[in-house]
Amino acid sequence: NCCVTNSISAPSRACIMTGQYSHKNGVYTLDDGLLPTHDNFAKEMQKGGYQTAIIGKWHLKYEPAGFDYYNVLPGQGRYKNPVLISKEERKGNTCPFDKTPGKIYQGHSTDVIASQAINWMKEHKDDNQPFMLMCHFKAPHRSWEYAERFSDLLKDVEIPEPENMFDTYEGRAYYTKLQTMSLEDMNEKDMKCELPANLSRDEFRKWAYQRYMKDYLRCIAGIDENVGRILKFLDENGLAQNTVIVYTSDQGFYLGEHGWFDKRYMQKESLNMPLLIRYPNEIKPGSTNKSIIINADFAPTLLDYAGISKPSYMQGESFRSILKNGKEPKGWRDAMYYRYWMHGDQHHHTVAHYGICTERYKLIYYYGKTLNKKGTHEMPYTPDWELFDMKRDPQEMRNFYNDKRYRKVVADLKEKLYQLKSAYQDNE
């Protein structure tokens, strides 16, 4: 139950860095950046005596702040022979950060980024100082370009299709009719071949799904291999026992569920983030729990492990004690607040919305307005609601909002939704 607060990359990354929702850190959409003057947990780590570094995907437009060392992709970066911008190369440069001349590294970006992370630990890490390193891969971002050595992986395998891949969206909110993130919206760059003609919607979905998933999983294989390289380095250099290792992403992703790819909406495939943490000194291997965690909790949790107090500007909470003994601190949340701001984005035609998620229910309000945020576009929309009951409908295909049996559930969830919206000081 680890949930993203805004399921799109730059806003989620800003939330992870700051422990704040988008309306507090200023990164509402992909067109916003995290100002170097803004507080973030890397700065707190530095104040606490930690050496800090970030390598790979940054994607927050401005120069990374709070890092003693960085070597990052400009913007989204590229898969093959990526360019990385280092702190040294940025010195004295006044152009927009992503336009900074960087260095070309030969190879696939996943391999390059892992190698640079290992190299930093070998060459730059101060053995007399604790460290915090962020290693951020580009993969498996669209358009899923994998390293050549994985080209035959799953070649003759048919990937099982999700049960709801042919969702008809009956009874659902109107956004399902507007979105252009269905498998049939994939283009030749995504598929890396000419698209077949004269296929029905479902026939195209079946064809596209197999190509999409194999490319995606080949990208994942590269990540798996390179995470292994990093873990091996930590083991071989006596660092594993006393290092907190966090494996996560900036959001979830639709892998054919509802016939979709991408993210942005509140169904579990998009809302839920992978989160695995290894810390042999304190976390029991193989342990799991169902506590509701949000990505705003990452920063205060990491500070907690570093022995640094949570600053007042952070909206998340440390979940260290949950990892240690499985017990939630008194007053731990029983619901999470979500908000997606990028209305009418030109590639996916998604609708702005906010909502609440509990262990059983999701209530979502699609308000459908730009609110003058960067990267939004006017797209007429009549506001509507969805209610999912994940106990009765775990695949989130039925909208129970207008079902009379759920009137009290809706009323209670609306009250809780607006309580959370107010508590987080989201006033728009």
Predicted feature residues:
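Formylglycine-dependent sulfatase
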Residues: N1-W385, P394-E428
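Residues forming the ATP-binding cleft of Hanks-type serine/threonine protein kinase domains
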Residues: K391
